[in-house]
From Swiss-Prot:
This is Translation initiation factor IF-1. InterPro entries: NA-bd_OB-fold, RNA-binding_domain_S1_IF1, S1_domain, TIF_IF1. Component of the 30S ribosomal translation pre-initiation complex which assembles on the 30S ribosome in the order IF-2 and IF-3, IF-1 and N-formylmethionyl-tRNA(fMet); mRNA recruitment can occur at any time during PIC assembly. Its main location: cytoplasm. It comes from Hydrogenovibrio crunogenus (strain DSM 25203 / XCL-2). One of the essential components for the initiation of protein synthesis. Stabilizes the binding of IF-2 and IF-3 on the 30S subunit to which N-formylmethionyl-tRNA(fMet) subsequently binds. Helps modulate mRNA selection, yielding the 30S pre-initiation complex (PIC). Upon addition of the 50S ribosomal subunit IF-1, IF-2 and IF-3 are released leaving the mature 70S translation initiation complex. It holds the Pfam family eIF-1a.
Length: 72
């Protein structure tokens, strides 16, 4: 899948789940399941509940996403 097919949203982590999965509330109010991108996992970026994150969604499944950036 190319980078052009990805939809980006800002959101907030509301719950941490096992296996680096997170429940994220998007800015439009929807709640999705998201996992950490490989580069964030490699660099040991820690994500806690309440963190602002940037999430990538595919147009094929809008209920799952990938966290690509952690804000302050």
């Amino acid at each position: 899948m190319s980078k052009q097919d990805v939809i980006e949203f800002d959101g907030e982590v509301i719950e941490t789940l096992p296996n680096t999965m997170f429940k994220v509330r998007l800015e439009n109010g929807h709640e999705i399941l998201a996992h950490i991108s490989g580069r964030m996992r490699k660099n040991y970026i820690r994500i806690l509940a309440g963190d602002k994150v940037k999430v990538e969604l595919t147009p094929y499944d809008l209920t799952k996403g990938r966290i690509t950036y952690r804000g302050k």
